[in-house]
Amino acid sequence: MQDPNADTEWNDILRKKGILPSKEDLKDLEKEAEEEEQRILQQSIVKTYEDMTLEELEDNEDEFNEEDERAIEMYRQQRLAEWKATQLKNKFGEVLEISGKDYVQEVTKAGEGLWVILHLYKQGIPLCALINQHLSALARKFPDVKFIKAISTTCIPSYPDRNLPTVFVYLEGDIKAQFIGPLVFGGMNLTLDELEWKLSESGAIKTSLEENPKKPVEDVLLSAVRCSVPAKRDSDSEDD
């Protein structure tokens, strides 16, 4: 097959007839074809990046040119942000059961900037069961906080049952708040929102509740008194 780029008399005739493109047009076509090839190649490289893990990107870093590295760095930051978000979301999310031998590792050495909420409980105490139920819901809602529970006497031998339930709030191994005994929690009327608010006051969780869902005792008593006293009739007022 004859080369259409060759400077032959026959090719010149074909160019004049418009059958072959001019040399200038041919160069433009070749340039466009080369640019298209580079574009397709670049898309293929980017797609390869998307299939790589962060570790694979690190391993193949020496094979990338300067333009590749800029594209990869942007993609790397995106993947890293997604990974961090996933790690945070899935960090805890449930209440972990521990015993006394796990205390130092799970509480004292829990980690920098990490809040830990520990519930000391015993089986057969209804309020302890209720708080465990509420803590499970809060653990799912606040997965960046470490919620743990332990049978009281496995952590503190001879710990009196009258002090149960007990909740300790820690930050970096230091106690920031403690709630001891049923009266602190308001008994079996304790709601999930009330417990969330109580824990948020210690700083352990960032609640979206705008106000304390539990009415002050004074307000409750005052409302009860008002409801129990009948309103005076107009005739009674006139007699006075």
From Swiss-Prot:
Disulfide bonds: none
Swiss-Prot/TrEMBL keywords: Acetylation, Angiogenesis, Apoptosis, Chaperone, Cytoplasm, Endoplasmic reticulum, Phosphoprotein
Start and end residues of each stretch annotated as Thioredoxin fold: 92-240
One GO term describing the cellular component: endoplasmic reticulum
N-acetylmethionine: modified positions: 1
Entry GO MF terms: protein folding chaperone; vascular endothelial growth factor receptor 2 binding
Chain's role: Acts as a chaperone for the angiogenic VEGF receptor KDR/VEGFR2, increasing its abundance by inhibiting its ubiquitination and degradation. Inhibits the folding activity of the chaperonin-containing T-complex (CCT) which leads to inhibition of cytoskeletal actin folding. Acts as a chaperone during heat shock alongside HSP90 and HSP40/70 chaperone complexes. Modulates the activation of caspases during apoptosis.
Subunit structure: Interacts (via thioredoxin fold region) with KDR/VEGFR2 (via juxtamembrane domain). Forms ternary complexes with the chaperonin CCT complex and actin substrate, leading to inhibition of actin folding. Interacts with XIAP (via BIR 3 and RING domain). Interacts with HSP90AA1 and HSP90AB1.
NCBIfam families: phd_fam (TIGR01552)
Protein name in UniProt: Phosducin-like protein 3
